[in-house]
């Protein structure tokens, strides 16, 4: 193999490794965004159930690390919703559902962009693999 084609092969191998790492990173981001979408979905469903309930609601609230506490929810007229940057605001259940639905839609767009990025990375990986596979033996 000539020095130039050896260097080309090393460059292609390095690009391939970098693209694989990028794909793994994008897949991790995709997983986190999908978990956020699932969180929004669960919150929306819970709010819809709470909205339709009458009287005090007996429930268990997670404290973390698998610990739960029994609680009675007497008032579901005000829901505290995070709006980012550590700021939370009180909203009606309907407003909270609207906010979470919008957030879910925005996250869906992020999923589409990440899937597009994964497709591009896959195409670049395929072209590198094709270039390496089509090289004449030296």
Swiss-Prot record:
**Top-level lineage group:** Archaea
Per the record, the major location class is cytoplasm
Cell compartments where the protein resides = Cytoplasm
What does UniProt give as GO cellular component? cytoplasm; prefoldin complex
User: What GO biological process terms does the UniProt entry carry, in alphabetical order?
Assistant: protein folding
Q: What does the record give under GO molecular function? A: unfolded protein binding
Q: Which UniProt keywords apply?
A: Chaperone, Cytoplasm
Q: State the oligomer form and interacting partners.
A: Heterohexamer of two alpha and four beta subunits.
Which family does this protein fall into? Belongs to the prefoldin subunit alpha family.
Task of the protein? Molecular chaperone capable of stabilizing a range of proteins. Seems to fulfill an ATP-independent, HSP70-like function in archaeal de novo protein folding.
**What is this protein's record name?**
Prefoldin subunit alpha
What organism, scientifically named, is this protein from? Methanococcoides burtonii (strain DSM 6242 / NBRC 107633 / OCM 468 / ACE-M)
């Amino acid at each position: 193999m000539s020095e130039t084609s050896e260097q080309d092969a090393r460059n292609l191998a390095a690009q391939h490794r970098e693209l694989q790492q990028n794909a793994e990173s994008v897949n991790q981001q995709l997983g986190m965004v999908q978990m956020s979408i699932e969180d929004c979905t669960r919150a929306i469903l819970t709010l819809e159930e709470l909205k339709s309930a009458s009287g005090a609601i007996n429930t268990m609230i997670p404290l973390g690390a698998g610990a739960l506490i029994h609680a009675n929810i007497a008032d579901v007229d005000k829901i505290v919703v995070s709006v980012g940057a550590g700021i939370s605001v009180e909203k009606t259940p309907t407003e909270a559902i609207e906010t979470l639905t919008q957030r879910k839609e925005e996250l869906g767009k992020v999923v589409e962009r990440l899937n597009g990025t994964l497709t591009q990375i896959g195409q670049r990986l395929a072209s590198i693999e094709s270039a390496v596979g089509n090289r004449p033996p030296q």
